[in-house]
Structures are given as structure tokens and as C-alpha cells.
């Protein structure tokens, strides 16, 4: 018979690693026993969908360039954008409610908040859809791979104005957020690191309506840059490698997941078990160690 403490743990895990149990699920988890319940709730099977199929189903597509505001085409264009983003939002809520992979969906939602982007500025449902599928594909995979895909994610590129950054006029927004919010954390880099990283991120162009990101070598700063004490020529992907290799990346991601899944006030374990489990930057390994703490 499952103890009251085990029932409490299963209930807690259900809400931490998912969105709470579906009808009848809590009883099934309790009946399965504490070990099987935990393994079921931390099932790292990715919540994958065919993006082309879903976009076709929801009629999310490239609408082309925005018509001028004083033309009759602007109203149906704006209405169609609103319809598309509403359809995508309702689809994702439906998936959250019905998924058989709650941890994967919860982690997709977690990374959606981590890589903060908003439709209010991006204003292209297709780009938001593309980002959602990038996040769910990498939600429980390798953090390095996620960062490499996200640094050239069209919604993030536009959100942080990276599409206009050139060697002669570098934009620091993506460089700063990449270090502060996405990979290293606050006060773990210098202002000179930001300026140099901004140079590494130059030369990327975006076709906004389609989400196609391209690289123009003529607009990229090709000379060596010095970031976190290391000097070499860098582009977006090699910059990600440099940042993800830092001990502060290991520390930052461990902190972020600890605060989301365990406690906003309790410190990380002093035995460094969380950080050690993330040595290879595998997100699922970091999640699986959570049983001892959640």
C-alpha cells in the first residue's frame, strides 16, 4: 500500500514535471508504486510533431511583405495574422492538456520562457511556430545544440535586432542577452565581452515573412575577437561553443532548472551533484537527478 508520503511526492512530481495529473492519472500513478510513478513522470520521450503538417493543419504560412497601412489589403492581412497566432496558441494549449509526454511539454514551455520572445514585436505567426518546434525538438536534449539552433532562430534574431548587425555597425542586443539571460547569467561577463561578442554575431540576414536566416560574409567581422579571455575569429556557432564550454553555463542552467522545479529560495546542493550531472550539457540528465530534491 502506498504511504501518505509517497502519495504526496507523486502529487508534487505531477505538478512539477508536468501540468498536474489528467483525470484518473493520479490513481494510476499511485497504484503503480513510487518508483514506476517517478519514472513515468520523468519520461524524456520528446513531444514531437511534424511542423509542416501542423502548419498546414492550422494554415500558418508566409503571408509575404506587409501591405502599406493606407491600402485596403492591410485589414485582411492583419486579421489573418491574428487568426494564425490564435490558432497556434490554442493548438499548444490543447497539446499541454492532452499530452502523454508531460515532461517534454513542460520543458518546451520552460524554454519558451527562457528564450524570451514575443509575438507583439515579431508579428509573424510562422516565426513563432518555427521557434516552438525548435524548442520542443531540443527541450530535453543537448543544451549546446539548442543554443546553436536558437542563436540563428528567426524569431529571436528579429526580437533582438540581430538581422541588421554588421561589422561596421554591430548591434549588442543578442550578444548581451545570449550571455546574461540565455547561457551564463548576470555578472558573469564584462561589457567588453558584449562588444566583442556582438562582432562575432554580425552578418546574419533575415527574410522576416518566411523566417529564412542567411549569412553574408561581407557583412561579418572576420578579425579575431577576445571574449572571456580567449582570442580567435568567431561566428555565431563558434561563439555558442565558447560560451557553453564555460563553467558559468553549467552553473547557470543548473540554477535555472533548480529554481523552476525545486525551490526559489533553497540553495543548490553543496555536493555539486546537479552541476556534475550537466557536465555533458545533457538536459535530461539534469532533470533525472531531481528525485532526490523535488
Where are these regions (language model features)?
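N-terminal accessory alpha/beta regions
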Residues: 23-138
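Active-site substrate-binding loop specific to GH73 endo-beta-N-acetylglucosaminidase modules
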Residues: 88-92, 124-291
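Cell-wall polysaccharide-cleaving catalytic domain and substrate-binding groove, primarily
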Residues: 2-52, 152-156, 164-165, 177-180, ...
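Short, compositionally biased low-complexity segments
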Residues: 8-16, 59-65, 80-83, 169-173
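Structural motif
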Residues: 1-9, 83, 98-103, 189, ...
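Generic detector of short, locally flexible boundary/turn motifs and exposed helical patches
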Residues: 3-5, 69-78, 110-112, 143, ...
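Hydrophobic/aromatic-rich, well-ordered segments within soluble, folded domains that form packed cores
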Residues: 8, 12, 102-117, 139-152, ...
